[in-house]
């Protein structure tokens, strides 16, 4: 098995991996190029530059400014809408259900870094999947951190930072941080 296969497999499995690996950097560069092509000339026809990267897509609208790390670890259901300048860092799977709305500047991060500075200097990273169930609305500027599941029908308020699971049919915001 090649080193890239091991690094990619480790990354997706949530194990430590070398984020400075040349082949992973090449995959990220390809995704950035696809995003740049779409963002330079946003249209339904040009959105294919991004969605063809995705592991699976039901139906999606991606407003300009969309960015992703790899794309290949993103799955979206039907009626997915990402408002302007959304960022999905998909070192691990990001699985998004049907009828999900992301406000502008929503960021979803699967990547994380060790607390040890020496490991960080060496490019050690790890990633955990993010799951967003059906009928979720995430308000503008919210940040979803690695390993989080947001339950069906939940609402995440604007500018919230979500570091723990959100139960189904609850609201989580800066004003109401307790489910």
Give short role names for the model-derived ranges.
Residues 1-4, 159, 167:
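Gly/lys/ser-thr-rich phosphate-binding loops in alpha/beta enzymes
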Residues 1-59:
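Terminal amphipathic alpha-helical/low-complexity segments used for targeting or macromolecular assembly
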Residues 55, 148-151, 166:
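Extended beta-solenoid/beta-helix repeat architectures
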Residues 58-67:
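Arg/Lys-rich RNA-binding interfaces used to dock onto structured RNA substrates
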Residues 66-76, 81-150, 175-179:
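Flexible, glycine/small-residue-enriched loop-and-beta-strand segment within the central core
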Residues 141, 153, 159, 169-170:
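Tight coil/turn sites that cap or link beta-strands
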Residues 162, 166-179:
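C-terminal end-helix/capping segment
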